[in-house]
A protein has these predicted regions:
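Long, intrinsically disordered low-complexity tandem-repeat segments
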Residues: 26-40
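Terminal helix/beta-alpha structural elements that buttress the NAD(P)+-binding lobe
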Residues: 2-26, 42-67, 74-109, 114-115, ...
Length: 411
């Protein structure tokens, strides 16, 4: 069947179903919501992935209840990420532990509808932006998924939205800023000093390849806030914007001398580390590390793109070729790095919820940095539509390719 969603034609291979809320202890509204005893409980709905490679289906959902250290957020905006697109497009290549139907989505912004036991940093009605981790192993997948009207989030992965920012602007942050912080500050990656409002200059440089991406835009700001000079790469049309975010020098990554240009921009300074963002960024970053003496490269993207894979079940020739290229590229990359004494490791943004980086970012840094404008919501949001039905349209747009923008759906 065919549905038109906010000017976007979405063809589904699965009939739209209406999902009945599960009758369990988690379906009742919590006692500390903004709903009084004389008011009907708010209803919830979600955009679910019903099966591998299927289109999202919108239907009723149980109203989640926040547990200790958690918030229930009434979402006003959600954003889509490559992880959502890859999960939908490739089936169980990633997130094999997720059951079907699944509620995807990591980026949410809205108002606090309820607080769980032990939460004193937020109150009902507060505007918040948060990183929803329902897709991660061991989490409550339905309750903590982002693509629904009400989402449970961890208090230590949420920050207040200051008055001068809208939910639409703030929602570009969660997964991107979390991934950037994981890459820059976790001990097993670049291990930089934590950001502050008055950073002390370290005299060192951080190289960020892919500065116009969502992760790169946040990494530039965090690296500057930790006292580092930043050399970034981007297409020429994005150079001015990256300088506004704090990059000292921006190089065209598509130029034939891009690696040499980055090395020249470093100018002999000590390189604290290199962050590679975007398909194809790993190899030039290892080359830059070898030329500058850097010893750590954080890899935020796979070596090959999954964009050309057909959206169908079974082993296809293109799938086999892609996986062969992926394995070969990773092996060659690691061998090249080790020969030069360089440690190149892949970044998984959600790991910050298990160490000090998560609370440092979401409790200590972002609230004040957003309030006084030291950290900007970047890249710019592009609203695809309104309502959960527009999430699928946003995923198709993302698959087609987006540059220096974050696709957002208003709820």
């Amino acid at each position: 069947m065919t549905r038109r969603v906010i000017g976007c034609t979405v063809t589904t291979r699965h009939a739209i179903e209406h999902w009945s809320p599960r009758l369990s202890s988690n379906t009742a509204p919590p006692s500390n919501t903004a709903v009084s005893s004389n008011t009907a409980a708010p209803s919830n709905s979600a955009a679910r992935l019903p099966a591998p490679r299927a289109d999202l289906v919108v239907g009723p959902a149980a109203l989640p209840v926040p547990g200790p250290g958690e918030l229930l957020v009434r979402n006003r905006a959600v954003a889509v990420n490559p992880l959502d697109e890859v999960k939908q497009w490739t089936g169980d290549l990633m997130y094999r532990w997720l059951p079907y139907p699944s509620i995807l989505g990591e980026d949410v912004a809205g108002e606090v509808a309820a607080v769980g036991p032990g939460v004193d940093r937020f109150a009902v009605g507060d505007r918040v932006v948060a990183y929803a981790v329902g897709m991660e192993r061991g989490r409550r997948h339905d309750a903590e998924g982002g693509f629904q009207q009400y989402t449970v989030v961890r208090e230590d992965l949420a920050a207040p939205i200051p008055p001068h920012l809208s939910a639409e602007q703030a929602v570009v942050l969660p997964l991107a800023v979390s991934t950037a912080a994981t890459a820059l500050f976790q001990r097993d990656h670049l291990a930089l000093p934590h950001p502050s409002a008055d950073p002390v200059a370290t005299g060192r440089t951080v190289v960020i390849w892919g500065g116009a991406t969502s992760v790169g835009s946040n990494a530039i700001q965090l690296a500057v806030a930790s006292g580092h000079r930043v050399v970034a790469t981007a297409s020429p049309g994005n150079h001015a914007r990256l300088r506004e975010l704090g990059a000292d020098v921006v190089v065209d990554y598509r130029g034939p001398s891009a690696v040499a240009d980055v090395v020249a921009a470093v100018g002999g300074a000590e390189v604290a580390g290199i962050l590679a963002v975007g398909t194809g960024s790993a190899e030039p970053c290892v080359a830059v590390a070898a030329a500058t003496g850097a010893r750590r490269v954080a890899l935020a993207s796979p070596s090959v793109s999954f964009g050309s894979l057909p959206r169908r079940a079974g082993l296809s020739l293109s799938f086999a070729r892609t996986m062969t290229r992926l394995v070969g590229a990773n092996l060659a990359l690691q061998l090249a790095a080790r020969r030069r004494g360089i440690r190149a490791r892949y970044v998984w943004g959600a790991t910050l919820m298990s160490n000090e980086v998560g609370p440092m970012l979401w409790r200590d840094h972002l609230p004040s940095a957003l309030a006084d404008g030291r950290h900007r919501c970047a890249p710019e949001p592009e609203v695809v539509g309104t309502g959960l039905g527009a999430v699928q349209c946003a995923l198709y747009r993302l698959h087609a390719g987006v540059s220096a923008r974050k696709l957002v759906v208003l709820l």
